[in-house]
């Protein structure tokens, strides 16, 4: 996996060091900043289109001790795993009518990559393109409709009874078909038609006891209403008698006031006193 254009800091035997076109900075300017760096030629990766650029860029640089221990047959990158000698087996299935299978020749030679060999499915653009879909695409709605059967809804001809439930007529479905969506379930047998009153025999003891309890409750409610009416009438009579007493008391006080006024008018001193008091006020 090593590349021929990868150069290390320490030159090997029979290999010329890499020279830069610009002037080299003195030891006083940069010091030992670039002592342990490695340089990579990116032109080979850009032209050939290989996918090992990031792995080579971030590969760990071997230490001087590791380089001194390497033998003549040791690879340049000790941290890489050895390649698998077994050939790569490509799958034999295809990806649908709209896609082409990737043959083994695509990865046999990394330098001969042809982007036209891989067919990329393009999505339709615009509102008209969304109507047609590929035959190999999966549609969950079509799957539910295919397995749930046909369902028809019967609407009444007139809207006179808005509370009347709709009748759902469902076609028979095969026994091997999976259950459909819970939104399309058939109506349960305990519907409105089965909610009728239970037939009770009027001659039975239970019916008689129930009627007797109902009659007792009705009589109690009627007696309670009668007592409330009598209490209300009694309170009305009491309020009327109190009103009569108050009226008689008002008449009595009015007569006493008139008598006192007549007495003060017959005494002249009292009349002048009353006039003087009235003038001062």
Curated annotation (Swiss-Prot):
* Gene Ontology MF term list: DNA binding; DNA-binding transcription activator activity, RNA polymerase II-specific; DNA-binding transcription factor activity, RNA polymerase II-specific; identical protein binding; protein-containing complex binding; RNA polymerase II cis-regulatory region sequence-specific DNA binding; sequence-specific double-stranded DNA binding
Q: Which residues carry this modification: Phosphoserine?
A: 181
Biological processes per GO annotation: cellular response to lipopolysaccharide; DNA-templated transcription; granulocyte differentiation; macrophage differentiation; myeloid cell differentiation; phagocytosis; positive regulation of gene expression; positive regulation of transcription by RNA polymerase II
Q: Where is this cross-link: Glycyl lysine isopeptide (Lys-Gly) (interchain with G-Cter in SUMO2)?
A: 121
Q: Where does this chain mainly localize?
A: nucleus
Which residue ranges does the record assign to the bZIP domain?
Answer: 204-267
- Spell out the residue ranges making up region: Disordered: 1-30
Where is region (Leucine-zipper) located?
A: 246-267
GO CC annotation, single: nucleus
Reading the lineage from the top rank, the first entry is Eukaryota
Report residue spans for region: Basic motif: 208-245
Sorted alphabetically, which keywords does the UniProt record give? Activator, DNA-binding, Isopeptide bond, Nucleus, Phosphoprotein, Transcription, Transcription regulation, Ubl conjugation
**Function in brief:** Transcriptional activator. C/EBP are DNA-binding proteins that recognize two different motifs: the CCAAT homology common to many promoters and the enhanced core homology common to many enhancers. Required for the promyelocyte-myelocyte transition in myeloid differentiation.
What is the protein name for this chain?
CCAAT/enhancer-binding protein epsilon
Q: Which organism is it from?
A: Rattus norvegicus
The taxonomy runs: Eukaryota, Metazoa, Chordata, Craniata, Vertebrata
């Amino acid at each position: 996996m090593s590349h021929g254009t990868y150069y290390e800091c320490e030159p090997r035997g029979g290999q010329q060091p890499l020279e830069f076109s610009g002037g080299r900075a003195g030891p006083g300017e940069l010091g030992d900043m670039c002592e342990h760096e490695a340089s990579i030629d990116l032109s080979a990766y850009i032209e050939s289109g290989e996918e090992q650029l990031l792995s080579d860029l971030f590969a760990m640089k071997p230490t001087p001790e590791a380089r001194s221990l390497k033998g003549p047959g040791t690879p340049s990158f000790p941290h890489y795993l050895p390649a698998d000698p077994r050939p790569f087996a490509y799958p034999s299935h295809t990806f649908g009518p709209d896609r082409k299978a990737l043959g083994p020749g695509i990865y046999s030679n990394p330098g001969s990559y042809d982007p036209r060999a891989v067919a990329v499915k393009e999505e339709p653009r615009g509102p008209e393109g969304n109507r047609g879909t590929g035959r190999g695409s999966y549609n969950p709605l079509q799957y539910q409709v295919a397995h749930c059967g046909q369902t028809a809804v019967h609407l009444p001809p007139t809207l006179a009874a808005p509370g009347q439930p709709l009748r759902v007529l469902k076609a028979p479905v095969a026994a091997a078909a999976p259950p459909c969506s819970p939104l399309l379930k058939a109506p349960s047998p305990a519907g409105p038609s089965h909610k009728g009153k239970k037939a009770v025999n009027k001659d039975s003891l239970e019916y008689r006891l129930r009627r007797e309890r109902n009659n007792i409750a009705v009589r109690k409610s009627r007696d309670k209403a009668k007592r409330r009416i009598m209490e209300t009438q009694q309170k009305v009579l009491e309020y009327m008698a109190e009103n009569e007493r108050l009226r008689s008391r008002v008449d009595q006080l009015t007569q006493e006031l008139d008598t006192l006024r007549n007495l003060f008018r017959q005494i002249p001193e009292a009349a002048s006193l009353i006039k003087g008091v009235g003038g001062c006020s």
